[in-house]
Amino acid sequence: RSPCALPACPLMHGTGMWVGVIIPHSLGGEVVLADNRTFDPDMLLQKIEEAKVQEIVIVGDVFAKPMAKALAGAKARNAPYDMSKMKMVNSSGVMFSADAKKSLLEHLDVVIFDSMGSTEGSMGTSISNRQTIDQDKTGKFQLSPTTRVYTDDGRAVKPGSGEVGLICNGGM
């Protein structure tokens, strides 16, 4: 069976379209779309279960927290969703906190791929799973080799200096 992804976020968002649709299709995968126009975590989890989705694409805490709450609620009702086919949660666009990641990982045995990017390409990634989730690493990304930070006057910012600058990325 080809990989199956579900972009939970709007397709007008780069995360939804690029990560949720274009990349899975370019890899020969299947894309499942939600039927509703608003975010309903229980409806989303039902769709994941029915379609045997392997990867879900979200936008940080605003999706992860309600999903974790719905997963916990279903478990408390003794009617847990079957998430056994899920392998990855892919997120970009807003903060994806360690607490939200941990909450999801209590219910999903997945890899969480949290990326920082733009139209020009990926600038950094953070990868977590049940064995590696670490409170101190949320919001810290492994930068891509071509990513740099420069001050307004064009000076390169030394990584870890705390100095604020503009993120620049070379190539995709």
Where are these regions (language model features)?
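Conserved AMP-binding/adenylation subdomain of ANL enzymes
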Residues: 1-7, 12-57, 69-70, 74
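Active-site lining segments that contact anionic ligands and/or coordinate catalytic metals
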Residues: 2, 86, 144, 164-165
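Extended hydrophobic secondary-structure segments that form protein cores and membrane-embedded regions
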Residues: 4-7, 87-91, 167
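Gly/Ser/Thr-rich phosphate-binding loop
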Residues: 26-29, 54-55, 68-136, 141-142, ...
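Alpha-helix capping/helix-boundary segments
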Residues: 62-63, 96
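Glycine-centered loop/turn positions within well-structured domains
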Residues: 65, 121, 165
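AMP-binding/adenylate-forming core of the ANL superfamily
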Residues: 160-172
